[in-house]
Amino acid sequence: VVSDRPKPMALIEGRPFMEYVTRELVRSGIDDIIFAVGYKGTMVEEYFGDGKRFGFCASYAYEETLLGTAGAIRNAGRYITEERFFVLNADTFYQIDYTRLKRLLDSLDLDMALVLREVPDVSRYGQAILDQDGFLTAFNEKTEEARKGTINGGIYLMRRSLMDTIPEGKVSLENDMIPRWLKEGKALGGFVNDGYFIDIGIPEAYRQFQEDVRNLVVI
């Protein structure tokens, strides 16, 4: 999509993609944001600074070496003061009800709540399955069958106690920790969300997001 900057800093109508993501968070009442930054991460800090002019308080957790998605969470842990916190990918934009995740975490007494989304062909992804009560029973499960199904949407609400179980080093949340937590019997659950979703990792989606911003689908 872009080669001179981190993907989340790709410009959309003169603003980095990540500004649209943070705006959505601020609108949802989230005003304390920790950026887990690696490649050209100083570009993120130079743009957002302390975050105040964007309506939030910003901290930056730098990675000396790539730590993977779970390793990055552990590395950012030194800035986390709350007992629970949201985690999301900076190169995806997903409109969800964040208070619903909080309610779910409390009502099912979960260690982590996550958002799933429905796709027309689940064989292209790893499938994530919830039971009728909302508990996660399978994650990243491969299927050859080209059919409709649910996959990981990439937004999580996690308890600090769960973060403390992530080992040091390069660790993947999706491939290492979530499957391990399921095996260990941790309480993971979620809901399927049908809000606007886009991942700008592919050029067509990047162009689509630009168009959606121009047409005020996203503001």
Spans of model-derived segments:
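Residues at the starts of beta-strands that form the adenosine-phosphate
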Residues: 31-33, 57, 111, 187
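A generic structural signal for residues located within well-ordered alpha-helices
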Residues: 13, 68-71, 153, 173
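Conserved beta-loop-beta/alpha segment of the NTase-like Rossmann-fold superfamily
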Residues: 45-46, 50-132, 165-167
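Catalytic-core segments of class I nucleotidyltransferases/pyrophosphorylases
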Residues: 84-86, 93, 99-106, 120, ...
